[in-house]
A protein has these predicted regions:
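Extracytoplasmic/periplasmic substrate-recognition and gating elements
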Residues: 267-333
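A structural signal for short loop-to-beta-strand junctions that line the ligand-binding cleft
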Residues: 77, 84-85, 113-147, 284-289, ...
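Long, aromatic- and glycine/proline-rich binding clefts that accommodate carbohydrate-like moieties
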Residues: 276, 329-381, 387-389, 415-419
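Glycine-centered hinge/linker elements that transmit conformational signals in sensory
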Residues: 206-238
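Extracytoplasmic/periplasmic solute-binding protein
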Residues: 131-135, 140, 159-210, 253
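Short helices/loops that flank or line small-molecule/ion binding pockets
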Residues: 71-83, 99-100, 161-169, 242-256, ...
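Hinge/lid segment of periplasmic solute-binding proteins
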Residues: 91-139, 151, 156-160, 276
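Conserved N-terminal structural module of periplasmic/extracytoplasmic solute-binding proteins
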Residues: 4, 8, 14-15, 19-21, ...
Length: 419
């Protein structure tokens, strides 16, 4: 998801925890204040405690919120001088915060821009202006338990066949479940592998604003792979993420979608990081995950606090640099966005595997489409609602798929103006 006096070479790095809005008092003119969530904040604090001179003459204060939602709530409520100079979060908040005037544009040199892919800047831009620097790739990936499954599945059907053949003998709780990111964000791969995505991307990386997914084909795949002969869930793919991580670690689920922020939990439990995208219905194809970047964003409050220049320097010297991203991701554990950091031998195998999975099959996370209710519901609510309707309530998958396609198509049409 400001104190600024450098006395000698000592950097004061502080943390405060907030569940809601944190009122930030006027600060010394050399202090840069960063807001982040409950995981990024503590990790940033560790990094700045080890190295203090990213911006000579400035101190850094990290304010950590109790959750990602709490960070968002605080940013929404911030006004006057109560906001941060920089915050770290996902890219889907950009349109609303840019329109509200809470973000400030960032200008990078050609050399700095060359260290990132163009699509990453798309994620952090609005109205033709860049508002942050890419920090890390934000994605999920699928792993499989090699004590149960000896080889990587080539298709969605391979996974379903294994589950149906072994669920009783092995006491399986599910076949594929979502352990990271929830049923909407983390669960996009579950939709996409069967043929449904909230927006369609053209081959050149642009958005197809007029086309939605094929509801008939998607519903057919749902019937084939997720329902039994009576139209009830066959148990392969649960409608909820509850218990997924524990069940996978206990050997009761052969395939799981995990997040790039907690892959080490599985690695430390002895599971190999055979990370890949969820295989599609056709062998050799893969379901798409959200593969956007999280960013470090410059706010308009930095100018009000008199620290716009050092805050911009922190963005480039730390957040957008090879050394900075390597140092940060040593604590955070996500795949770095910067090209030099991606190649570093200090970046762990699990991080690189997550990054490779995102490169193989992902779509950008476009908040203008995902956050709007123009179609009757936003993506975040409508996605899990589909699985509840079909897998729990027993509703017709085609009827519900047509509703979903219409909702998502309307949301894309409405969100076009916010790109």
């Amino acid at each position: 998801m400001k104190n600024r006096l450098l006395k000698g070479l000592a950097l004061a790095v502080t943390m405060s925890f907030a569940a809601g809005l944190t009122l930030v008092p006027a600060q010394a003119a050399s202090e840069i204040v960063i807001w982040a969530d409950e995981t990024r904040g503590p990790n940033l604090t560790k990094v700045f405690a080890k190295k203090s001179d990213w911006v000579p003459g400035s101190t850094i204060k990290v304010v950590s919120f109790s959750s990602y939602d709490a960070l968002k709530d605080a940013l929404d409520k911030a006004s006057g001088t109560t906001g941060p100079d920089i915050f770290v979060a996902g890219n889907d908040w950009v349109p609303a915060l840019a329109k509200s005037g809470k973000l400030a544009p960032v200008v990078l040199t050609a050399a700095q821009r060359a260290q990132f892919s163009p699509s990453q800047f798309f994620d952090l831009s609005y109205g033709g202006k860049l508002y942050g620097v890419p920090v890390d790739v934000n994605n999920v990936g699928m792993v499989y338990n090699t004590k149960l499954v000896k080889t990587a599945p080539k298709s969605y059907g391979d996974m379903v066949k294994f589950y149906l053949a072994n669920k009783t003998k092995l006491g399986l709780k599910a076949g594929l479940c979502v352990a990271g990111g929830g049923m909407s964000w983390g669960g996009l791969s579950g939709f996409s592998a069967l043929g449904a995505e909230p927006y369609q991307m053209n081959a050149d990386g642009t958005v197809n604003f007029t086309k939605s997914f094929d509801a008939t084909a998607f519903a057919k795949n749902v019937k084939t792979y997720l329902l039994d002969k009576n139209g009830k869930s066959n148990g392969f793919y649960p409608a909820t993420d509850t218990g997924c991580q524990d069940n996978y670690l206990a050997g009761k689920v052969p395939f799981a979608i995990i997040g790039n922020w907690h892959w080490r939990t599985f690695a430390e439990a002895g599971f190999p990081m055979n990370i890949q995208p969820v295989p599609g219905v056709k062998a050799g194809t893969y379901g798409k995950m959200f593969g956007s970047v999280s960013g470090a964003f410059l706010t308009s409050y930095a100018e009000a606090h008199g620290v716009a220049v050092p805050a911009k320097s922190l963005l480039t010297n730390f957040f957008a640099s090879t050394k900075g991203q390597v140092a940060y991701q040593a604590e955070e554990g996500r795949p770095p966005a910067e090209k030099g950091a991606q190649k570093s031998q200090l970046v762990l195998g699990g991080q690189k595997a997550m990054g490779a999975a995102a490169s193989k099959s992902s779509i950008p996370q476009i908040g203008a489409f995902l956050n709007t209710n123009a179609g009757g519901a936003n993506y975040w609510d409508s996605a899990p609602a589909y699985w509840t309707a079909v897998l729990v309530d027993g509703k017709d998958p085609l009827v519900e798929a047509k509703k979903l396609a219409a909702i998502w198509k309307a949301n894309v049409a409405a969100g076009k103006a916010d790109l």
